[in-house]
Amino acid sequence: MKIKAIFIVILIIIYCFTSCVNGNAGGITAPSLGGVPMRLTPEEDKIAVFSQGSPDGFWARNDRGNGPPFNCSFGRSNAVIANDVLTLSLTKGGEKGFIGAEYRSSGHFSFGYYSVSMKAAKCPGVISSFFTYTGWPWDEIDIEFLGDDTTKVQFNYYTNGVGGHEYVHYLGFDASEDFHEYGFDWQPDSITWYVDGKAVYQARQNIPSHPGQIMMNIWNVADTNANWAGKFDESGLPVHAQYQWIGYHSAEEGAIDK
């Protein structure tokens, strides 16, 4: 009995350590999501297909950028649609020394399934992403690639400005080498993230409720955030993230406010 009790304690410690390392803030991981069906984006749900040129209702940002942890401005010329893809680039230049890119929808979208086919940027200290963002009161749902290790992806969300829900999923492939489909199903009581149609993580606590813009960007972190995304290595510039299409399937009537 004593040996059995010790074994159980060891298992509990291992579970807690693994949850901490992965940033599992009360979510449900892939082994427990086996009953969730596959979900790949059909053609009719693709609201922006870059092989067809510049889509209506989307635009590229052109300004000084954000404060920390961002360490670049955003340039419209660094968001280019050509050769069937949208390419977002991080380059040297501008008043901050570096110019990133951000591409976003004009309209706000509510509950539903959001998806993207993308190839991540690979460079220490560089973030490439697909996410929704409201502005005030700051609801956000993230798919983020940390450029120091693109064999994993980070999921996160904010509700009324409260975050701390980071979860790192190990992909089993390098996201910078080829296009893959990533998505999340946002419902009033849950967010379920998908990779190539397979559900891999689900959150159920303090779920966002405000409609947000669909956004993608590439940017470099400040040195104070090196422990998160790796120390930025500017010798790797220019670096690029590429996108083939964006998908959205509404979960409710009137879900798009253009």
Feature annotation, model-predicted:
Residues 23-258:
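GH16 jelly-roll
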Residues 8-16:
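Bacterial N-terminal signal peptides
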Residues 1-5:
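Positively charged n-region of N-terminal signal peptides that target proteins for export
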